Amino acid sequence: SRAVLAVADSLDLWNRSFSPNAQIRLAVPEPRVDGFDFNDKAALLSAIGENYALIVNDELVAGSALLSERVRVAVDGDSSRMRTFDYDVDARGFWQIHRAAPEHLVNYVLGLVRSALGGRTKNTVLWDLYSGSGLFTIPLATLANVGGDSSSAVGALGTTGTFGSAEPARVLSIEGAPIAVKNARRNIGRAGLSRDIVEALEGDVAQTLESQVFKASKSSKIVRRFAHPDVVVLDPPRAGAKAQVCKQIAKSGARAVVYVACDPTSLARDVGTFRELGYSVQSLRAFDLYPETHHVESVVLMSKAD
């Protein structure tokens, strides 16, 4: 992108000396400003400021260890009413590389969740598995409900408000990377969401579900507030969720599953497992988030008959 090239030029990256086989990574979130002139290099560098990271062999050489990202989400699917969510992401951690990917994926996933929920808003519970820094978690908690005044929900640009007549969805998020969970908790707190609404757990997804949900005391907070999801969103790594997690989702009683996948082979295997567990595919959409490569991002909606 122009932002990456502008920062690379400003750092004189092309004329630096590096050791042989050095791993060099330059991460530069692009400014999210409507009508911004990316051809104005001085204005671009000013807008970027210190929001970039040059990492060489996993060591921060220049910029910031914590990067700021911004995602706009359509309120109740209405693109004329947009909400903005801000995220802190570790420069060494994972974030979608395509600049438009987070926004497209969040809006599409939220649309599927709303569809799966139908008219139900009361006591809605959602799971966000392999949740990273909270890309889906925060919008799910504030915008998943199809009733009530979601436009006044907490989280837009750090402001707070009320959820109108509808209780916000309760979201259980689970992520294995400690630094991603740390960022997620920071982002959740900045959005003004309490732990009664969103609980972010750290650990292997299968093991955490087993210990915190299925084998935990019925009196535990996790079991009381989060154990029975209406919809499960999962965005596993390339290896996929695998059979144990698929079976745990089915055991939870979730009536719908939104599966975000970066590897079609793993997705096909896991969809086969879900089908054996009584789920059927309702929709499948592919996103070309890796132009000029053979990679593709896929989002599948599956539902289970009552």
Which sequence ranges carry the predicted segments?
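Accessory RNA-recognition modules of RNA-modification enzymes
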Residues: 1-153, 158-234, 241-242, 247, ...
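Short glycine-rich anion-binding loops that position phosphate/pyrophosphate groups of nucleotides
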Residues: 237-239, 264
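C-terminal substrate-binding/active-site "lid" region of AdoMet-derived donor-dependent transferases
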Residues: 247-251, 255-301
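Flexible, glycine-/basic-rich loop-and-beta segments that form/coincide
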Residues: 305-306
